[in-house]
Curated annotation (Swiss-Prot):
Record's catalysed reaction(s): ATP-dependent breakage, passage and rejoining of double-stranded DNA
Site residues (Transition state stabilizer), renumbered to this chain: 117
Function (record text): Topoisomerase IV is essential for chromosome segregation. It relaxes supercoiled DNA. Performs the decatenation events required during the replication of a circular DNA molecule.
Pfam families per UniProt: DNA_gyraseA_C (PF03989), DNA_topoisoIV (PF00521)
Gene behind this protein: parC
Top-level EC class as recorded in UniProt: isomerase
Site, as annotated: Interaction with DNA: 38, 74, 76, 87, 93
GO cellular component, one term: DNA topoisomerase type II (double strand cut, ATP-hydrolyzing) complex
Boundaries of every Topo IIA-type catalytic domain copy: 30-496
Membrane topology: Peripheral membrane protein
Name of the molecule in the record: DNA topoisomerase 4 subunit A
Amino acid sequence: MSNIQNMSLEDIMGERFGRYSKYIIQERALPDIRDGLKPVQRRILYSMNKDGNTFEKGYRKSAKSVGNIMGNFHPHGDSSIYDAMVRMSQDWKNREILVEMHGNNGSMDGDPPAAMRYTEARLSEIAGYLLQDIEKNTVSFAWNFDDTEKEPTVLPAAFPNLLVNGSSGISAGYATDIPPHNLSEVIDAVVYMIDHPKASLEKLMEFLPGPDFPTGGIIQGADEIKKAYETGKGRVVVRSRTEIEELKGGKQQIIVTEIPYEVNKAVLVKKIDDVRVNNKVPGIVEVRDESDRTGLRIAIELKKEADSQTILNYLLKYTDLQVNYNFNMVAIDHFTPRQVGLQKILSSYISHRKDIIIERSKFDKAKAEKRLHIVEGLIRVLSILDEIIALIRSSDNKADAKENLKVSYDFSEEQAEAIVTLQLYRLTNTDIVTLQNEENDLRDLITTLSAIIGDEATMYNVMKRELREVKKKFANPRLSELQAESQIIEIDTASLIAEEETFVSVTRGGYLKRTSPRSFNASSLEEVGKRDDDELIFVKQAKTTEHLLLFTTLGNVIYRPIHELTDLRWKDIGEHLSQTISNFATEEEILYADIVTSFDQGLYVAVTQNGFIKRFDRKELSPWRTYKSKSTKYVKLKDDKDRVVTLSPVIMEDLLLVTKNGYALRFSSQEVPIQGLKSAGVKGINLKNDDSLASAFAVTSNSFFVLTQRGSLKRMAVDDIPQTSRANRGLLVLRELKTKPHRVFLAGGVQSDTSAEQFDLFTDIPEEETNQQMLEVISKTGQTYEIALETLSLSERTSNGSFISDTISDQEVLVARTR
């Protein structure tokens, strides 16, 4: 018969993964609600206790303990066992350490511990209370992995370890994050709940107001703590403890003495220093980790004029000096993972301790009764001592003596065994008194144990007494301060930024930088660093407190605070937007750049190749949350081939749109509605099917120029294009030719000397040259031509203009721009 079974992969995977999930949920990552331990932690404690590796004895090599645990109870890698052992020894991870370790057991800086062959370990004193009475049949045992030895499924847990030390872990479909608490407060809450089983959460929180982290800190948010204790989920703010320390010379420094739970100190110091290096907060001179064996201390030295409170607020908001701690209190309850609140945790622990105390009392009672039975036999022997001695002397051997005692004097098997093994010195008068006293003590003990077993009130009194003994022995003060409200961190951004003069430059290809006036003035404008195939489109003097807006041909806008731009030399290329903006496309170009002081007022107009136009408010461009990594839309394009032709600030003038086929339309800018960023706009000009928009500009002068792809140029009067309404076809500004027709390559206003300053992107740059508007044309063969637009004579509307050179018509235009 074949052992091969045909099963679907879906069924096999589902069944196997379900089995695996159940294993890692119950046997690996989640703690038991009764003793607060994961299986590996329980096995470590039990194995070390079984081997006598306890607090009152000397330390033993960690490797020996790990080997015993792995060989007897936990058949997994030694690293997982050692890591768990090390964590239980770290006083910055546990409120009460369960393992004491000699040697390097890691640090708050995330340093790894020394190898287990170098360190030594033993159980801590309080860990002994988790294992107390385990030898008295108080908990159930199960066979280990190879059925050679039994291990406990839970520990007796004489204190509520789940709350005291907390727990964290991730399993299949479940995760847990239970914070540590103060031992005294937890025990007080348990004692109160023993007396008041239906105690309200509010009353319990009078005894246990919140977590108590081993690293201290300030916990904010009483309402969230209550929510977490009620539902098992919640989020609180954990803030570092800081103080402002005065230094000589009027300087100050921020001193950090406590940091949030689970925060890596070295990483925190590095992040704070990164803030200094990147000048995100001006005013930080130095960041030092001054921690030593006396305690944690991080010093943040400030400049003399620095605003210490504003800098501290910034660091709290943008570094791990303040973090959110998320409660997710999941534990194994009756073999099932459950999200539990405070009342459920306490009641489960009380129920567990009830079982432990009753089982322990039954064990002790049975032991006392067994001993009492023997003591009664010994006392009876002493009353008939001569007869017993004679009977034993007449017996053939020990077995015969025992049988004679049982037959002649009705002793039990146990009593007979005790009599025949009795040592002669025990027959003195003193020992008779001792036996009688022992009998009385045993009877009292049995009575007490019977009361504990039979009377619930007596049992609970024992439970409370034992808890109070643990509290008395191990109580320590609360480390974390609790604050009812979460404080909102307000940062005066303006006060963080040192106002400095700088020059901002942007290229069409997306390179940008800021340059100090010293570096800028040491070079000429032509020495700007850029790629050979790129073009400088924007240079302007600005303040570091201002803002830069970049509008692209694909309808995206990019925001950058000036102070966040990389400060580089004028001859450096700059930083490309693709390094930070994840959605900056390869074919995307910068169309327009603008520096603004505020976003309170201002309008922009955008015109696309498909002839659509819109106005939108600058207020909608105020910094968005993901501005550092993503651009946002300012206009919706109709299709993938559509591009934005013009973007400019709105002025109260007419707009003039010119198409490639030579149609020009003039209308008032007030006809264009103000719309949201996601809209595509309205029709600006009625295009023919084979036509598209070439240029659009505001009418701010009396004339404009038209350049064709063949290199023909003309200047014509604005009045030749009368004002009409938007969405019309417009008038032709070129004469149609049957062969080699002219198509508009670029059109724009011809600015006068007085009006040019308003539109010149380089007005803040000191130049000796006259401010004359020039048209630069580069042919496809690389020839460059420059024409002073004001020197052109006015042409008729229907003329095609004049070629700028004799050979340009054969070469055609590659690039054209005004400056």
